[in-house]
Amino acid sequence: MSNNRRGRKNVEKKLIDSAAFLVGSVGPNQLTVRDIADHAGVNHAQIHHYFGGKKGLLIATYKQLAFTHVQQLERRKISPKNLGDEPLASITDDYFKAIIRAVLDGQMYLVRVQIDSNLSMSRTTLKQLAELKNAKKPTSEMKSAVAIAMVVEFGLSSMEQYIDEVLEMTANDKKVFMKYFFEARSLGFDKILK
């Protein structure tokens, strides 16, 4: 790989990493090209040069976040029969926060990046669930099971600190809460797979 190519990849990675870090805290609407460039330590003109502007960088960023999310969940063998023993948001928190911010900002094209790139774990899980039940297509119950898991995961990602603060959660409270969290997350799957 030439030095120019290596330099380009390095700058692109810095910009995507910076955008991924920042978008979860301020959202795509408030995030500026200068914020991203300053955080990455590069000239803001490079965003236009490499990505065609903020929108192109955000698309690349959401694709990378989705790819990392899928990779981490596949590594843990997450499936309808095995949702794991930790909140998924704790594995790829940047992904969850970025998706939440895109939805709140009304930027659904960023949410669609994972679907259009075939990197939606929710869609993959839904497909796996249908296959496990020998269904030609997912049923309303299957979609609901995945939706409940999504609501529980995204809810924890966005509300955990609030819950801890408002309810003054002790270590024991948190232990009981997490037990209920896992039961709620798997509720629909357990009903379908029994």
Regions found by a protein language model. Give the residues of each.
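Short alpha-helical scaffolding segments that buttress acidic/His motifs in well-ordered protein cores
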Residues: I99-V103, V146-E153
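Helix-turn-helix
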Residues: K14, S18-G56, A60
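N-terminal intrinsically disordered/low-complexity leader segments
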Residues: M1-K9
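Amphipathic alpha-helical packing segments from all-alpha helical-bundle domains
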Residues: H69-R75, Q107-N134, S140, S144, ...
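Hydrophobic alpha-helical connector segments
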Residues: A60, V70-L104
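Non-catalytic, well-ordered alpha-helical scaffold segments
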Residues: K55, I59, D93, K97, ...
